């Protein structure tokens, strides 16, 4: 499983790495709900330190949480005050992490301003607060834990220099937004945000399982990987491939086969494209059985597994493989890509068959 470069990957899609592009179909003046993400300039850990026991339920003593610095408290305060400056916008739940934050914004009615203008004003307020805190760094001992020598040097430089078009003061230029569409999505967002501190602690405990490896040689192919690479060495790996036309009876037979295989320690591999394949993968997740999943898109710069993938990855039960580089505008998988993913799954299964 040697790591190699993927520049000549025959499956490669055009590079399109930006996570900060706006949705072309969305009017950012309209009534809408968003989850906003902003990252500190240089990924500096300015907002606090995540502490606690990842095995303790959220909300109980010593459960995972972030202990905010004064800088983190200032950003949280600015977020809460967005409504004071733009009455059409309500600031919802915010989860600060050491070097970024996620926050929910509700545009309650159509507004003249673009959402980007509202967030630009928020950043200006944060920058003012950051400058004020900067003058106190020399006398506040509790900043010693949160701000390293590189920060002090970078801050001094930033405070005495005009910002260029590529860099910000406190935050990176731009922001990422996700638009709420379906019923129940808001609750899922809030649960995800509250779970962020626990997820970070789990990643710290299992760093190798959450690191993207580029150009891994898998059955003669170069793939990017995240998760437990040792699953590729299991003696039995079975491909999950179910036709879209499969009957309920046929699906039940497939489930029975993969359930028995999982009970004897077999690994399943699949891109999980059809409804039947998804149903079998869900069954295997519930059984806490090992699974190799082929992704329809590649890994971004800060890729991490989400949802059910996260805990499966932490437990060493999951390996994610991607034959293509990340494409931020990836929308719908093509028939050719489906065929390629199933062929890759077939080769992985045959390799261990």
What spans do the regions from the language model cover?
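Short catalytic/metal-binding and nucleic-acid-binding patches
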Residues: 1-216
